[in-house]
Amino acid sequence: MDIFGRRWKNHVAKIEKNWKKKITSKDTIVLTGDHSWGRNLDEAQEDLNFIINLPGRKILLRGNHDMFWDAKKTQKLNNLFQGKLEFLQNNFYNYQDYALVGTKGYCYEGKDSIEHFLKLRTREIDRLRVSFEAARTAGYDKFIIFLHYPPTTIGEQDSPFTKIALEYNVSKVIYSHCHGEERFDDSFKGYVDGIEYKLVSGD
């Protein structure tokens, strides 16, 4: 992670120190992706163990670098790490009277064709809707969205992600992926149409 700037130097130790200073076993934390550079579960195990050993209830969202996590294997991961970690994909978790819903998301960064981008974004919207509907079926009507990618592409005033947030009357949209101060304003921050947008990248 040092490639993203000096503040990432010794980032593991910094995160551990700050986490243990602020988080207790009674807290719920959603980590919005990029948990490991590991290409498979064996390679990612050390990083996941690091997270497991931190205090609090930990809910993990899939990031673009999480090669160990195939979306189709989410239930397998939940079974494997039961009581230790919770994996958020095509499902939801509760926090007080809120349903925590989420998906990786997608925005256009110029690395693929528009057609491919639109296909992937539509797939992510479909997955997010599955989360919403699972929560609704369980009786929830208050929602917080978690994404890995920002909810809009640079320059967009809205997107399918902001529209679905309005459709389900969510209170917050929390996302990451944007590293380095030059990228902190890539998408919405603060209140837009009554919804609070928060960038929570590690830096």
Model-derived segments and their meaning:
Residues H35-S36, N64-D66, G105-Y106, P150-T152, ...:
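Catalytic metal-binding/acid-base residues of hydrolase active sites
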Residues I15-T28, I52, H116-D185:
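His/acidic metal-ligating clusters that form di-metal
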Residues M1-D2, A71-T74, D112, D185-F188:
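Short aromatic-enriched loop/helix-cap "lid" or pocket-rim segments at secondary-structure transitions
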Residues T32, R62, V101-K104, Y175, ...:
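Short glycine-rich loop/turn motifs that provide flexible caps or phosphate-binding loops at active sites
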Residues D66, A71-Q157:
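Conserved catalytic scaffold of divalent metal-dependent phosphoesterases
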Residues D2-Y95, Q157-V170, D193-S201:
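Core catalytic region of metal-dependent phosphoesterases/phosphodiesterases
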Residues Y175-E196, G202-D203:
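Acidic, low-complexity terminal tails and accessory targeting/binding regions
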